[in-house]
C-alpha cells in the first residue's frame, strides 16, 4: 500500500496523479514541472496568441522546478539531501544543458563526480 502526498506549495499536478507517493521508506515524486503554485504561470515563458512558445528562460524554469521539488519533499517530511536519482527532460540540449547543469551543480554539491 502507498501513501499519497500532495501539497499546495507546488503547482497542482496536471494529470490524475499525486505530487508524490511513499511506499515503505521510499518516496517517488511524479513529474514536477516549472509552474508556479501561486498563479500557475511558468516563469520566463512567453507564448503567442496561438499558444506557441516565443521564448523561454531555462534558468527561471529550472529554479522553479527545484523550488517545486523542495516543496514536495518538505510536504512529505523528506529533504533535498535525500534525493538519489533525477530524470530531466530539456527542450534544447545544446542551448539548455549548460545553464541547467550549472544550477544543478549548485544544488547538488554533495554528489559531484
Regions found by a protein language model. Give the residues of each.
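Short, polar/acidic, helix-capping and beta-turn segments at strand->helix junctions
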Residues: 2-113
Amino acid at each position: 500500500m502507498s501513501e499519497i502526498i500532495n501539497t499546495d506549495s507546488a503547482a497542482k499536478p496536471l494529470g490524475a496523479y499525486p505530487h508524490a507517493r511513499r511506499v515503505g521508506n521510499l518516496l517517488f515524486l511524479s513529474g514536477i514541472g516549472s509552474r508556479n503554485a501561486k498563479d500557475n504561470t511558468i516563469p520566463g515563458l512567453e507564448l503567442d496568441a496561438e499558444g506557441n512558445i516565443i521564448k523561454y528562460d531555462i534558468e527561471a524554469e529550472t529554479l522553479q522546478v527545484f523550488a517545486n521539488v523542495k516543496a514536495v519533499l518538505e510536504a512529505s517530511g523528506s529533504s533535498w539531501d535525500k534525493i538519489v536519482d533525477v530524470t530531466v527532460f530539456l527542450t534544447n540540449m545544446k542551448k539548455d544543458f549548460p545553464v541547467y547543469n550549472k544550477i544543478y551543480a549548485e544544488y547538488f554539491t554533495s554528489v559531484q563526480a
